[in-house]
Amino acid sequence: MAFGAGGGGRRPFFRRRKTCPFSGPNAPKIDYKDVKLLSRYVSERGKIVPSRITAVSAKKQRELAQAIKRARFLGFLPYVIR
């Protein structure tokens, strides 16, 4: 008996692609002083969360990473969270 042959199977599940939270008319501006916004994109271990999880576009992910690194350097965000 062959799997996939025949008709009555379920439709494959497709997850809808999330849109970038920083694109759009009322999107927040990426700023290194906005610790509350930046901390949403840092894991509990202190690492920058990848864009495939946060659905941030490549350009905005680079801006976000730069802002997080700048905030860490200035002491607004910790490098490591214990």
Swiss-Prot record:
A GO CC annotation given for this chain: cytosolic small ribosomal subunit
Keyword Ribosomal protein: yes
GO biological-process terms attached to the record: translation
Entry GO MF terms: small ribosomal subunit rRNA binding; structural constituent of ribosome
Domain of life: Bacteria
Pfam families linked to this entry: Ribosomal_S18
InterPro entries registered for this protein in UniProt: Ribosomal_bS18, Ribosomal_bS18_CS, Ribosomal_bS18_sf
Alphabetical keyword list: Ribonucleoprotein, Ribosomal protein, RNA-binding, rRNA-binding
Presence of the UniProt keyword Ribosomal protein in the record: yes
Family that this chain belongs to: Belongs to the bacterial ribosomal protein bS18 family.
Described purpose of this protein according to its UniProt entry: Binds as a heterodimer with protein bS6 to the central domain of the 16S rRNA, where it helps stabilize the platform of the 30S subunit.
Subunit-level organization: Part of the 30S ribosomal subunit. Forms a tight heterodimer with protein bS6.
HAMAP family: Ribosomal_bS18
Protein name: Small ribosomal subunit protein bS18
